[in-house]
Structure formats: C-alpha cells, structure tokens
Amino acid sequence: MITKSSGDGVHWPSLIGALHEYAVVGRRVKVLSSALSSLIPPQARVLDVGCGDGKLDRFILRQRPDASIEGIDVLVRPKAQIPVRRFDGVTIPYPDSSFDAAMFIDVLHHTPDPLAILREARRVARVILIKDHFRNGFFAESTLRLMDWVSNARHGVALPYNYFSQSQWSDAFAELRLNVREIKTTLRLYPPPASWLFDRSLHFVARLEASAPS
C-alpha cells in the first residue's frame, strides 16, 4: 500500500517499495524456490533462519513435498505460512543435529556477525543453504545498499549493510569448516533492463556441508 508522508507529498519508501513488490517479488520467489529446492537433501527436515512470512518456503515445498520446513525469526508474523518459533537472533533454540539442513535467504547481511549465526546453524544441521550477495566489482556496495533499502526499509528491517566479498565468504566458510558443494551465481532475479544493474555477479545460492570431525 502506498502511504502519505506527514505533509502532502508521497511517501517515497512506500511508493518505491510498492513498485518493487509488483515488479520483482513474485519473480524472486519463483526463481529462488527453484534454485533452492534442488539443493535440499532428500526427505530433509529444514530450518529456515529468518524465515519472514514463509512464502518462499511454501513454494519450495510445492516442488519438494518430501521435505518439511519450519522457521525461526526475531519477529513472528501473525500469518506465517510455515510453523515459526521466535528466537533472539543469536542462539538457535534447538539441540545439536536437530535438522538435516538450515537455510539463510538474504539474512546473513542483516546480522552484525554472520559467522556467529552460521556457527549456530552448523551446530544444528550438517547442510547449510545460503542465498546472499557478493560485494564484487564497481559500484557493488552502492547497488546492494539500494536494493536492500528498497526491499526492507519500509518494513523496519535492520539494515547494517554487512556485505562480504567473494573472498571474505571463502575465508568464512574455511574458518567454520564448511565445504562448498554447489554454488549458483546466475540467478536472473530481475527482468531486463533492471537485470543489467541489479543481477550482474551480485547474488549467489550455495549448498555447504560441514566437514566431519577429525
């Protein structure tokens, strides 16, 4: 919904957000559900960390009815489309090895310490699926900040703009002893001509697996 500012002008975050919702969100859900559903282990119990309303999970389950997905979030939405449990954003409220896989879909760059919550995910699941960004190339930082602001500012989501370069992600995975088993970098989340600016090499989906204890 487009709202008014306190004066007579249009509230621009709401207007731009509404246009983004119309042009991008539906496509994003379809593209990501397809990309992620192929990476989930067979008959997996999956935890979606920072699941939001669970709409993406519902689309994944249409393609993977053998799996089950439940979520955790710092804010539990009243009409979430999967079971959701509240958590503090730091400690995942489940015992070790409770899940076959954990997912972070555009969540880690909203956290102050991505490695800390990834370490928690590694504790509860051996397979970790990530959709996030690469801060690589000219204007990557400013482009990612713009996308984040358009998508999230009107919802009151924290925006620390904590983007990693590809080499920083590689270092983080190595530190946590997470092996990259598959990675997708051509996602086509945006229709042309927006894709020329907002797709590029800024997005990735990855499947990681924890190394066996030595």
Please identify what each model-predicted range represents.
Residues 47, 52-91:
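Class I SAM-dependent methyltransferase SAM/SAH-binding core
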Residues 35-41, 92-93:
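Glycine-rich helix-loop-beta junction characteristic of Rossmann-like nucleotide cofactor-binding loops
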Residues 115-128:
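A short glycine-rich, Lys/Arg-flanked "PGG" loop and its adjoining helix->strand segment in the class I
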Residues 58, 133-195:
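C-terminal alpha-helical "lid/dimerization" subdomain adjacent to the S-adenosyl-L-methionine
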Residues 3-34:
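Class I SAM-dependent methyltransferase Rossmann-like catalytic core
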Residues 106-110:
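A short His-aromatic
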Residues 191-214:
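Core SAM-dependent methyltransferase catalytic element
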Residues 103:
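A conserved beta-strand element that flanks and buttresses the S-adenosyl-L-methionine
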